[in-house]
Design a protein with these regions (language model features):
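Bacterial N-terminal signal peptides
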Residues: 1-8
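Intrinsic structural disorder
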Residues: 8-9, 163
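N-terminal active-site segment of His-dependent metallophosphoesterases
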Residues: 13-85
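Extended active-site neighborhood of metal-dependent phosphoesterases/phosphodiesterases
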Residues: 15-17, 84-197
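Short, solvent-exposed beta-strand-terminating loops
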Residues: 20-21, 201-205
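Active-site-proximal beta-strand elements of phosphoester/diester hydrolases
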Residues: 25-38, 151-164, 203
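Active-site neighborhood of phospho(di)ester-bond hydrolases with catalytic His/Asp-centered motifs
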Residues: 30-32, 67-72, 97-103, 196, ...
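Sec/Tat-exported extracytoplasmic proteins
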Residues: 35-38, 59-63, 90-94, 186-193, ...
Length: 205
């Protein structure tokens, strides 16, 4: 079974391996729109501490196998310090995680490339960089407990920030290249799974 917890708001040189446990369970905690702001004001610091406390409570009580952050994570204040504080917290939990950007993350004062380098510096991050040095769209296999065959697929996609065409809206959307990539990835996984569609979840802002 799969459990997803939604909250608004083996360490090696290799990426962590995602795997169902012996009971056939894989628990995911999802955090979104956290809008962490460090050292902007006393109020923002107070709210940030509440957010970190909530993250700690979920990590320690629910003990998820994987954490997904779906955008608008660290958006104001000393954003480099905010990201480092978040990564330090995740290192204490030793839980693999993935980040997708939201529309407000690029407003934080750090470029997408800078944020991407910070995120991928963590040994618990499953994110990788694309050719532009930004977080790549990810297709992640969750393996069965006893083998190396995927039992489920997770897709983490960047939905962009601002519209390239202001006449049709303020914020961006998935590109056709992303849609084709997702379609082809799903088809490939189906073929590799003896023609059976692999159970999948997609995460994005």
């Amino acid at each position: 079974s799969i459990t997803i917890l939604l909250a608004s708001l083996q360490l090696s040189a290799h990426k962590p391996v995602l795997r169902f446990n012996q009971e056939g369970r894989f628990k995911i905690a999802q955090f979104t729109d956290m809008h962490i702001s460090v050292d902007k004001s006393d109020y923002c610091n107070e709210q940030a501490e509440k957010t970190f406390a909530r993250l700690s409570r979920v990590a320690n009580q629910e003990k998820p196998d994987f954490i997904v952050f779906t955008g608008d994570i660290v958006t104001r204040g000393d954003t480099r310090k905010g990201w480092q504080r978040l990564l330090d917290s995740l290192s204490t939990y030793k839980i693999p995680f993935c980040v997708t950007f939201g529309n407000h993350d690029p407003e934080s004062g750090l470029s997408r490339e800078e944020m991407s380098r910070i995120i991928t510096s963590s040994p618990y991050s499953v994110n990788s960089l694309n050719s532009a040095g930004q977080l790549a769209d990810m297709d992640l296999d969750v393996l069965s407990y006893s083998g190396d065959k995927p039992s489920m697929a997770l897709y983490c996609l960047d939905s962009g920030d601002y519209s390239p065409d202001k006449s049709i809206g303020k914020y961006a959307w998935f590109s056709m290249d992303q849609i084709l990539w997702l379609r082809n990835s799903c088809l490939k996984k189906t073929q590799e799974n003896d023609g059976n569609v692999l159970n999948s979840l997609a995460f994005f802002h």
